[in-house]
Regions:
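Glycine-rich phosphate- or other oxyanion-binding loops that anchor nucleotides, phosphorylated ligands
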Residues: 1-147
Length: 147
């Protein structure tokens, strides 16, 4: 994924939860599924919007932790546990978990604002506004489709 690309989560997971000592899969919290699955209607609608507007995107797994990803070691760690991960961030799985608990449909999208490279802090500051604007534009088009 490159800066400016969009990831639509078909599912989300935590990549910093470790209850394996209690017999759980890595990433799974007690009483919760390992993956929180997005509403397929929402995923398909976003896929349509992104294709129509020629925005490079992928559909797939987004993982969440409580810390900013910077450095090769963290990237390797996440990939070892979730090899199919498309993006990592700090909020999505919590949103998905809340929607799951409330039995509400959801989807999470991410416009890539940085990579987990060594200079991620600098890249994030440079591109966070651009990524946010793109996410907002995509969301507005998505809402038009649902209307």
């Amino acid at each position: 994924m490159a800066i400016g690309d969009v990831v639509v989560a078909d599912r989300l997971a935590y990549h910093d939860v470790d209850l394996t000592a209690f017999g759980y899969e890595f990433g799974r919290m007690s009483g919760q599924p390992l993956f929180f699955k997005s509403d397929q209607t929402f995923v398909s609608a976003f896929e349509e919007v992104l294709a129509k507007h020629h925005i490079h995107s992928k559909i797939g797994l987004i993982t969440t932790s409580d810390s900013f990803m910077a450095g090769k070691e963290k990237t390797i760690f996440v990939k070892e546990h979730f090899p199919e991960v498309q993006a990592v961030e700090m909020e999505g799985a919590a949103i998905a978990q809340a929607a799951y608990a409330a039995k509400r449909p959801f989807v999470v999208i991410r416009s890539i604002s940085d990579t987990a490279a060594h200079d991620a802090n600098i890249t994030f500051e440079e591109f966070v506004v651009k990524a946010g604007k793109q996410s907002a534009q995509v969301l507005l088009k998505f809402l038009e489709i649902l209307d």
